[in-house]
Amino acid sequence: MELATDEEFLPVKRVKPQPDWPPSWKESYFYDQGEIYGEISHHGYAYAYDNRWRETLRLLTEVLAPGARILDVAAAQGNFSLALAELGFDVTWNDLRAELADYVRLKHERGKIEFAAGNAFELAFPSLFDAVLITEIIEHVAHPDDFLAKAAALVRPGGYLVMTTPNGGYFKNSLPKFSECADASVFESAQFKPNADGHIFLLHVDEIEPLAKRAGLSVEKIALFTSPLTAGHVKTEPLLKILPRSIVNLAERVSRSLPSALKKRALVQMGVRFRKPN
């Protein structure tokens, strides 16, 4: 399945904020303003989100056709769920915060989407999924090996697990490496916190294969993306405000053509497509 223009994958329906919304809705709308509605306060963040958006959809649509069943774990405001539903996939939205389901429903225009709030690993789904999507989650858990194995258990034989996470090899990362941690349980009290402040481990490329093997998965594709220049990490935010998007996208494409060893140190984000054996 081919990706076309970026706009096709953004939910087009805009909701109007209300003063009586619960706090989680207001927070979700705040992120939607910069991520899908174009009200950008930090251009580097917006470009990084756009890169992750496109890479995530590409990792899925390269191998799955419309009609495939996809579980979006910890889906929050549901933008990936909505986009995939509009592309014709049979999507199940999931999040611990049950009240967010109605916020997602406000933005839903077309496509099949079901809602399953709660701990995805404790819910009784009627069948396994063709793909499970875990975006920006694994860096918030103390035991990424266990998390990956539990997510893999929801995938049918021959199906896929698609993950995005910050690249642990990025030169500005100062967090510990999971594979070098003697006792990850010391981080359990800090897990599940939101945003970058809640990051515990950022996985390195060389950790992906061992984690996949322990989860009974194979690694089909690893994509490194988002230059620190386009993410505004090296004092480029003022430039990003005035540069044409075409120039920013060109800088991003050039960064992805770097030698593999350099990309592991220079690029901010990582996307992985795992496959479960038949």
Where is each model-derived feature located?
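Conserved SAM-binding motif I beta-strand of class I
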Residues: D90-D95
